[in-house]
Amino acid sequence: MKFSSIILLTLLICSMSIFGNCQIETNKKCQGGSCASVCRRVIGVAAGKCINGRCVCYP
């Protein structure tokens, strides 16, 4: 429950951002592959990439 509320709060803050450059860095490791399944599970959207060995999701 706490994890879900953190994600919702992050999305709320990101949606209010003037610049709209919001990204959510996960603790899931990756190697140049797609992070779509991780992002779909974390934020419900399949937009993400592998940056510095971690999945970064974009709402």
Swiss-Prot record:
<dbReference type="GO" id="GO:0015459">
    <property type="term" value="F:potassium channel regulator activity"/>
</dbReference>
<keyword id="KW-0872">Ion channel impairing toxin</keyword>
<keyword id="KW-0964">Secreted</keyword>
<comment type="similarity">
    <text>Belongs to the short scorpion toxin superfamily. Potassium channel inhibitor family. Alpha-KTx 15 subfamily.</text>
</comment>
<keyword id="KW-0528">Neurotoxin</keyword>
<feature type="disulfide bond">
    <location>
        <begin position="35"/>
        <end position="55"/>
    </location>
</feature>
<keyword id="KW-1220">Voltage-gated potassium channel impairing toxin</keyword>
<keyword id="KW-1015">Disulfide bond</keyword>
<feature type="site" description="Hot spot basic residue in hERG blocking currents">
    <location>
        <position position="28"/>
    </location>
</feature>
<dbReference type="GO" id="GO:0090729">
    <property type="term" value="F:toxin activity"/>
</dbReference>
<keyword id="KW-0800">Toxin</keyword>
<dbReference type="Pfam" id="PF00451">
    <property type="entry name" value="Toxin_2"/>
</dbReference>
<feature type="disulfide bond">
    <location>
        <begin position="30"/>
        <end position="50"/>
    </location>
</feature>
<feature type="site" description="Hot spot basic residue in hERG blocking currents">
    <location>
        <position position="40"/>
    </location>
</feature>
<keyword id="KW-0732">Signal</keyword>
<feature type="site" description="Basic residue of the functional dyad">
    <location>
        <position position="49"/>
    </location>
</feature>
<feature type="site" description="Hot spot basic residue in hERG blocking currents">
    <location>
        <position position="41"/>
    </location>
</feature>
<dbReference type="InterPro" id="IPR036574">
    <property type="entry name" value="Scorpion_toxin-like_sf"/>
</dbReference>
<dbReference type="InterPro" id="IPR001947">
    <property type="entry name" value="Scorpion_toxinS_K_inh"/>
</dbReference>
<keyword id="KW-0873">Pyrrolidone carboxylic acid</keyword>
<comment type="function">
    <text>Blocker of A-type voltage-gated potassium channels of cerebellar granular cells. May also inhibit Kv4/KCND when coexpressed with DPP6 or DPP10. The occlusion of the outer entry of the K(+) conducting pore is partially reversible and affects both open and closed channels. It shares the same target in rat brain than BmTX3 (AC Q8I0L5) and AmmTX3 (AC P60208).</text>
</comment>
<protein>
    <recommendedName>
        <fullName>Potassium channel toxin alpha-KTx 15.4</fullName>
    </recommendedName>
</protein>
<feature type="site" description="Aromatic residue of the functional dyad">
    <location>
        <position position="58"/>
    </location>
</feature>
<feature type="modified residue" description="Pyrrolidone carboxylic acid">
    <location>
        <position position="23"/>
    </location>
</feature>
<dbReference type="GO" id="GO:0005576">
    <property type="term" value="C:extracellular region"/>
</dbReference>
<dbReference type="GO" id="GO:0008200">
    <property type="term" value="F:ion channel inhibitor activity"/>
</dbReference>
<feature type="disulfide bond">
    <location>
        <begin position="39"/>
        <end position="57"/>
    </location>
</feature>
<feature type="signal peptide">
    <location>
        <begin position="1"/>
        <end position="22"/>
    </location>
</feature>
<keyword id="KW-0632">Potassium channel impairing toxin</keyword>
